[in-house]
Amino acid sequence: FTSVGKTIFVSRVNKAAIKHQMTLIETNLKDNYSVILFPEGTSSDGLSVLPFKSSLLGVIEKENMKDYSFQPITLSYNKLDGIPIDLKYRPFLAWFGAMDLLSHAWKFLGLGRCEVDLNFHKPIKFREFKDRKTASDHAFKLISGQILRNNNTKKVNKIVKLNEFKIL
């Protein structure tokens, strides 16, 4: 299964593996594959964006990689069965902490039809960034800002308050 998607497994424990993982990213880019990184380093409760880990963006600093592009993408869950999701219900959608993936996925699928927003931000050539930390900060600001706009809870709370519904 992972060979179909060309999955690159990232070790968050073994810092010595970062160089090898960067080489895999570089090789895949040179072979014209897109690489998607989830830079938070772990998952959150969906209420905020965690600080980004910039180490795997180190390919940006390599001179032979300057013509490649970097495109931040925001992924957010905003509606359940067509109804905007109130802030306090977001943790039911997120997989985080010590949650068992299978039982969480089963509960998630039982919630109803969930709408996912994907926002593709402007691609930028690697050469536009001073270093990996600058690229990471740029992506963090774009993504966290978009999450706030997508999760506009003041607007959501005016539309409907899910906690006011009672089961008959």
Question: Where is each model-derived feature located?
Answer:
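Membrane-interfacial amphipathic helices and adjacent loop/beta segments
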Residues: 1-27, 120
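Short helix-loop-beta-strand segments that form the rim/entrance of peptidase-like active sites
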Residues: 7, 33-34
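A cross-family acyltransferase "interaction/gating" segment
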Residues: 14, 33, 45-130, 134
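Glycine-rich phosphate-binding loop signature in dinucleotide/nucleotide-binding domains
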Residues: 28-32
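Cytosolic-facing loops and C-terminal tails of multi-pass membrane proteins
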Residues: 133, 138-168
